[in-house]
Amino acid sequence: MKEKIRMSVIGLGQRGLGLLRGVLVKRDDAEVVAVCDVYSDRVEQSLVAIREATGKTAVGYTDYREMLEKERPDAVLVSAAWEYHTEIAVEALERGVAVAMEVGGCYSEDEMRNLVRVQEKTHTPFMFMENCCYDKAETLATNLTRAGRFGEIVHCAGAYAHDLRSEIAGGEENRHYRLRNYRYRNCENYATHELGPIAKLLKINAGNRFTSLVSVASKAVGMEQYVLQNAEKYPNLVGKKFAQGDLVHTLLTCAGGETVLLRLDTTLPRFYERDFTVRGTRGFYSANCDIVFFDGDIGEEFDTKKAYRELFVSGERYAEYLPEQWRSITPETRNAGHGGMDYFEFDEFFTCLKENRAMPLDVYDAATWMIVSVLSEQSIRLGGAPVPFPDFTNGKWLNRPHRDVCLINR
């Protein structure tokens, strides 16, 4: 593909506008030629941002099909509401427009099957933009795993633990899709931040696969009580019910014998964490306190606080296992979004496009990680019964080559 990528953005809410400002307009190898959102004020805001950052004028649309037809961009960032990610991506793929699709859950298995089918048919480049796969903790743990330092991996865990009550309750005013999802669905609705890095570490879809899923949800009272406590701010939500359980725990099994535990925790008071954890026969990694622990580091210790104090940020001792991107990170890269991982994922996307390389987070990854929303919804509805996990590779997982996103000295 050409050295200068003609880029477009569909979906200009908080995430889309943030990536436009933080990453896309700053790249020498990309030019944002068009933007689209159903809300015209968001379109105008984005056009101003492009003009102020680059001095160039892009074209704004409220109909993404019209934009794709008239502008014929080389690539598109899909960052609209969750419900429309796949629909827009399929339309772009069929037109030969490379797709960078933002994260979220899905709504049916057929939706994912169709996405995979269209990408396989068109061979149009597609990357699932799970930025947490590029974060410092996740890449450190992956490289320690690849070096054999943790021994054989047995279990991984992760969470999306983020107090989103104000964002959800403000959904009408801010036109945010989370409100309707939390009112009417009960599932693991945002699994990919924790599941993506775990799946890559376990080589899911490339020598390993998920085989079953069990999910249970707590009662849903966090949002209702939050609305009551802030009734003057959210009068339209007073008395409204929310289907989404306050905590959802999901357990997955793997063909390789590993287990994976996920937690969705977004409607009760708390601080942010992803709780990324890797357990092996020779040690473990815990991202919350950046702990690297190897067998024998500490003897039998019953004072848990003492052990945490001794091992706190011990991951810093293993900087040689960080990929080059993190060892040489600049302030500009850190400021591009989420401490650097947004820059790294888009750098990968554009590099793969220009060099005609396979995307490291592909359509099979997208389908596998997104389908957790649907499967968890089914399992919760069945009282926590196990449900089989579909294989979107149609058996190719046995022999597909694996590719990590950020290896040492890559």
Please place each PLM-identified region on the residue numbering.
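Beta-strand-loop-alpha-helix segment that lines the small-molecule cofactor/substrate pocket
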Residues: L68-K70, A75, A81-W82, T86-Y134, ...
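N-terminal Rossmann-like dinucleotide-binding module
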Residues: M1-A53
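Predominantly a Rossmann-like dinucleotide-binding segment in NAD(P)-dependent oxidoreductases
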Residues: G11, T122-M127, C132-F242
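Active-site beta-strand termini and strand-to-loop segments that position acidic
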Residues: T250-G256, G280
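Conserved SAM-binding strand-loop segment of SAM-dependent methyltransferases
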Residues: T57-D63
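C-terminal helical cap and adjacent loop that interface with cofactors, partners, or active-site loops
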Residues: G18, F271-G280, F284-C289, D295-R410
